[in-house]
A protein has these predicted regions:
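Short, hydrophobic alpha-helical segments
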Residues: 113-125
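Glycine/charge-rich, flexible interdomain linkers and switch-proximal surface loops
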Residues: 45-46, 126-129
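Residue-level detector of alpha-helical recognition elements and their boundaries
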Residues: 25, 39, 101, 124-127
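C-terminal boundary of histidine-terminating zinc-finger modules
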Residues: 92-105
Length: 129
């Protein structure tokens, strides 16, 4: 599919589990081989924040996503927490960023989107020069 379409770029999304990160590495290698720009990696369901204490819990053990990003020289764009409000709004088909723009996770998504757009613009500029 990547050979038939002219892709603007890619963002790889993974959970912190080792098995999921194997797929990320495969994806990185495939996009590199097909010359599709890689704008970064996102770790989804990275941790859970206890609402009563604010303490972070690693649901899947110690993450290796950061090490993978460093090894292959790509930015880790964000570590998105396992958030009940995000899950609830996704199930309803409502973007969290629209309904709760000040929520911490909404802010993470907004910052990621802005960062990715900047990278796309820089990539487009470098293609024209």
């Amino acid at each position: 599919l990547t050979q038939k379409l002219k892709l603007t770029g890619s963002v790889l999304v993974s959970t912190p589990q080792d098995i999921a990160l194997i797929d990320v590495v495969r994806g990185l290698k495939m996009f590199e081989k097909t010359n599709v720009p890689i704008y970064g990696i996102i770790e989804n369901m990275s941790y859970f924040v206890a609402p009563d204490t604010g303490k972070e819990y690693q649901l899947y053990g110690e993450s290796k996503t950061e090490a993978i990003a460093e090894k292959y020289d790509y930015e880790l764009l964000a570590k998105i927490p396992h958030d009940p409000l995000l899950m609830e709004q996704c199930e309803k088909g409502h973007p969290l960023t629209d309904l709760f723009p000040e929520h911490k996770v909404s802010q993470m998504f907004i910052e990621m989107a802005e960062d990715i757009l900047k990278k796309i613009k820089l990539n487009k500029l470098s293609e024209t020069t």
